[in-house]
A protein has these predicted regions:
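Positively charged
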Residues: 1-136
Length: 136
């Protein structure tokens, strides 16, 4: 189900709680909402649809991916980026890394581990910042 975009900065600034099996419906809603906004958005976190859970969805080079409880476990090659957000107006500068190794759970709650680079890595870092309550 496509949900309304949350623009409440106080809510967005809260650190997300771990996602559980009961949150799989939220994961699907997040993906549905991202697809509905794909012309102007490449990634979303659950707090952007008003749910304070550690779930992200993003465009992974044309194939959409949902991550539950994502954690960056390694990062390299820092750089400065300028990013916008569907939940906030304007753009902001952020420190990012060209390569990140992420551990997460898929929709079957299986643990996954993968290295992402470039634009996809930047998207993931932005969405994980949302999970941490960091406004970008």
């Amino acid at each position: 189900m496509v949900r309304e975009i949350c623009r409440d900065e106080a809510f967005l600034a809260q650190k997300a709680e771990p996602a559980m099996k009961d949150d799989l419906g939220t994961a699907q809603d997040l993906l549905d909402t991202l697809l509905a906004h794909k012309d102007g958005c490449v990634g979303m976190a659950a707090n952007m649809i008003g749910v304070n859970k550690r779930i992200i969805a993003f465009d992974n080079d044309g194939a959409y991916l949902v991550m539950l409880n994502p954690v960056i476990i390694r990062q390299s090659e820092p750089y400065e980026a300028e990013e916008g957000c569907l939940s906030l107006t304007g753009t902001r500068r952020a420190k990012r890394f060209r390569s990140i190794k992420v551990q997460w759970q898929n929709e079957m709650l299986q643990t996954r581990l993968k290295t992402f680079t470039g634009w996809t890595a930047e998207i993931i870092q932005h969405e994980i910042d949302h999970c941490e309550g960091i406004l970008i």
